[in-house]
From Swiss-Prot:
UniProt superkingdom: Bacteria
Entry protein name: Glycerol kinase
Catalysed reactions listed for this entry: glycerol + ATP = sn-glycerol 3-phosphate + ADP + H(+)
Function: Key enzyme in the regulation of glycerol uptake and metabolism. Catalyzes the phosphorylation of glycerol to yield sn-glycerol 3-phosphate.
Amino acid sequence: MTEKKYIVALDQGTTSSRAVVMDHDANIISVSQREFEQIYPKPGWVEHDPMEIWATQSSTLVEVLAKADISSDQIAAIGITNQRETTIVWEKETGKPIYNAIVWQCRRTAEICEHLKRDGMEEYIRNNTGLVIDPYFSGTKVKWILDHVEGSRERARRGELLFGTVDTWLIWKMTQGRVHVTDYTNASRTMLFNIHSLDWDDKMLEVLDIPREMLPEVRRSSEVYGQTNIGGKGGTRIPISGIAGDQQAALFGQLCVKEGMAKNTYGTGCFMLMNTGEKAVKSENGLLTTIACGPTGEVNYALEGAVFMAGASIQWLRDEMKLINDAYDSEYFATKVQNTNGVYVVPAFTGLGAPYWDPYARGAIFGLTRGVNANHIIRATLESIAYQTRDVLEAMQADSGIRLHALRVDGGAVANNFLMQFQSDILGTRVERPEVREVTALGAAYLAGLAVGFWQNLDELQEKAVIEREFRPGIETTERNYRYAGWKKAVKRAMAWEEHDE
């Protein structure tokens, strides 16, 4: 083991940049966090300022070391985990972005996606990239930038512009432009990457007219990519040695490294991943086949279902509807009523993700009667998170043939005991909440630490997977199915709301 005592995980999320310091026993020593601006130029469009992402992330790194009172030469390695799919294009020479980052939630490329469907690309994309055609993924976002920023496609062909997901952007900045890389997990979310040959897909690049010259080199999730002296006194060079997209990092942090193990992360959106080992399972039920990390950071595969609005729907109750003052209040108000009084909230504010994939669905509240009050709507909004999770799990079990015995959970909303109990009730499955909640950062730290020998193998980490609380189903099957049938009816009516007549 190295004499250096700590690993730093950088967790670049959708609404904030965070830095977490961990010791050899995977204890969290200190955390620093900075929020940044969400930019909404038009309805359904979402952007970030890449320079603000960099500024907030780099300052959290400086802050977290100061908070922990440790110097940079005590850091063995840095791991990075990031919001996936969010797309940045910048000038190689100056490091200046040519456009704002187009965020994963942004729906502006729905028309490009319609063209791909009309051109019969669905089967090819599913078979080779593991994905469905949706504005969510990076490929159509890159095309949009190249289509709309004058002269950019020609500049990209000349090697003057670079593309990256957020991990790539951060490493480029941290290494002063010396290293242009991504890892397999992030590459697998671009719709430009062949998950079987593990290389950029020439046909997808041709179809979307994206020059190969602008793409990063793709590497394993656990190896040394480069070094940085950011935040360090006296210029100590710290290896950057772990990268994984946030959901794959959480899967690894939960130590779901064996076939059939699954986790659900309750953040801005909800993301369920099931490790399928060395086998890429093709989904017949609207799920994604994606790349995950095996026990040493090598390529494994996973099935993934994405729910776009989870914590974001609670923020909507707080910020737009003013029904609660704080996200934590939602549990208190939800438990003031016995049920939702027949109300279902479908939070399809930006369309629906897995297994529906309908960018034209919109949010709706069904079952309103005169007796419905704010508490019923708050409760129904919380319940919608659990219903959407069941939608995904049903699809996952059908594709994999694996019946899940326990679901590991993480993310901000898992502190809500009402939601976790309802989740167990509506799934009819055990829900396991870990003691260490920072599993996304843990995953990045584990990947970075394994690469530099800070930890020798995962066996050293197994005892860290302590379950703080287990939730068990508390309702009958008939009641479960009755409630779920109501949800399915509500979803059906929220779909295709925005679709334009041909």
